[in-house]
Structure formats: C-alpha cells, structure tokens
Amino acid sequence: MGGRGAPPYAGGPGGTSPRDSTVSRVSRAGVLAAYRDGVTVICELAAHFTDVSWLSATPCAEWRAVDVAGHLRCVADDYHEYLDDAPASRLARLMSTNAPADSLARKLARQNAAELAALPDVSGPEHIMAFADSARSYGRRLTPCWDLSHHTYRGTDVTVGAMAGAACAEWHLHAWDLARSLGKDYRPADPELVLTAWRAGTPELWPVLTGWDGGDPWSFLLTASGRDPGWVQVLGPDPGLTAAPE
C-alpha cells in the first residue's frame, strides 16, 4: 500500500478530517483521470533513471529506486487479485478482522516484503513496464464495477471506486518517491483530490487523523503516509515535475 509502516497519526481516537471532505465530493471521472496521471508520471520518471541511479536510495526506508519499481509491479498485480476475489479477497479477510491501523500496516508491510523478495531479478525498466501494463489494465476494469463492494472495515463498506482512490494515491506517492530519488520534486495536479481519494479507500485510518490545519494537502498526505516531505537525495537544477494535464 502507500506507506511502509503505521502512519504517524494512527495512534489514538479523535481528530478532524481534511476539510471534512467525503468521497461523494470526488467525481469518478476525476479519480480515474488522476489514476491515469499517476501511472503516466511514474513512467516518465522511470525514463530519467540510469543503470546506476536505479540503485539510489529513496524516501522509502531500505528501498532503492529499483525496489520501488518492483513494489509498484507487485501492488498493481495485487489490486487485480483483490478485485477478482472481492468481496472475499485476502485483503478483505484481513480488513474484516477490524484490527487497528498499526497492526494492519505491519501485516501489509510483511506482505510487501515477501512479494518483493519473490520477484525475478530484472531491471527497473522491466519492472516499470510490467507495472504500467498491469495498472492500466486495472484502470480499465473499474468503471463497470465502481459501486460494488470491495471490502469492509468496522462497518464501513469500501467500494471498488473507493479502492481505486487508494490506488490513485499510491501511484502519486510513489511517483514522489522516485522523483526525490532523482533529486527532483513532484506534486500531483490536484493534490486535494488525491488526498480525498486516499481517504475514501482507507477507512482504517479515519477518523483517527489529527494535525490537519487546512494547509497544503500534498505535504499533509506525504506526512500522513509516513514520508518526510523534506527528504532529499540530490538537489539538481531541474525545477521538478508536475502531473500531465488530463
């Protein structure tokens, strides 16, 4: 998923949600467009890596850029599996335990590590090509089943569309990871939409969210997903990247 461990805010009850946004305020077209943009920008960033820079550190602790590429490939395939088996997938069974967010995060982190270790030892570009094919194929599956149940958590029904929002946010967050590894910066074209979409697909994290002050939604999402917005690899002259307009 989007983070590597329990989010920093996932420790206690209470708190407020970002601008009290709800999934109903995010259009299907908007989420799908942002989803496609996330896949596109990952592919664009991947083209900037060399054989050497694929081995560079990233904001994801202990993951090199090539590991992020492999993780993206795994997660895109996982999303297909979850949709194939919904609403009785292994993710749905995990969420139905109603475990707290930090426990869920640890279990998903172990799953991520096991899947990454099982991947073939291929190059970053090969992982990204497999990711892009899988992620785009998943995107094409979403519209016909958008309102169907994907899984539930503590009485909240997470639809296929809401899970698409979580996937959308995951792509943009990992785009930032890759950009930072290159010494660049990145933010999506509509960070508030991405934040709201992420919220819709992750009810296990809400409403245990604190610290929102109406500031920059992208910085907030980076921090909420366990990232340090100030993480720096190499700052070059490149002014950064923005998501391609739809």
Provide a role label for each language-model segment.
Residues 4, 8-33, 48, 52-61, ...:
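Structured surface interface patches that mediate subunit assembly and partner/cofactor docking
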Residues 111, 115-118:
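Penicillin-binding protein/beta-lactamase superfamily catalytic region
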Residues 44-45:
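Basic, often amphipathic N-terminal segments
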Residues 66-110:
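Conserved alpha-helical segments that form or flank metal/cofactor-binding pockets of metalloenzymes
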Residues 40, 73-77, 136, 172, ...:
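Solvent-exposed alpha-helix faces
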